[in-house]
């Protein structure tokens, strides 16, 4: 999600604080000054005397780690129906984006806020979870994947951190909540999520138990839909530390087994520091083309296997069409290069 200018201003006010010991608390406290956030919190708190709402997951992790935050996720101890009623009472627009899984998306001044009811897993099959709504915060935290993603905060910046995720984040450790193999079997997409978070946050070596659990259950990744798989890889590819992948033999081996079509991962390690830090600003399809274009029919197979949209398919095939031409000085002219950048920029 690319924030609107208004969202950028909001996030700048909220999250870019001075570097001091009160960083976390001051970052969260500033949110109260924002109209949109304040409206949502007031709507939930006024619904009943026992209703609670907290920030959760990525936005809390990023605030603690002093990162740019591009979305805000919220957790509540109300049922989805009660969340809808609470928003209706305050005339806040919303849509039921994932109500079966407990998620309501509030919309204020074109800013989206995902509000999810506390849950516990009743059944899992490696792809989807059957959930039951709860009012127990630790129960909700225990179903999350990693300790660094199970940190909650109220509007004042007071943390609820039952699995010491803040400590792991500060120490550069990426730990599953509970047994790694059990958590992977609940949702095999966690294999890719582990790699993304490890490359971005780890300051240590892999826990051998985690790597063994991943390799033991790697075949389960094939049960994940191509859409979910590619969406998660997109987050990995556009993350700030993707270039580290080629230097991490465990992660590289796993990615090569999941995506054998990626032929040129090592090329990213050769980019300069400026380029590596700006991955997230580069269009996904353009980055993807670097991985899959190799002068064979690899691109066609990748498009078929991952069911790319017509727009993405067109762009990838366009970039592929220039692969052989770039080695022929007679046909590959400056205008061809300009066309590539124009086409890529226009469609990005």
What do these predicted ranges mean?
Residues 4-348:
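Catalytic cores of the polymerase beta-like nucleotidyltransferase superfamily
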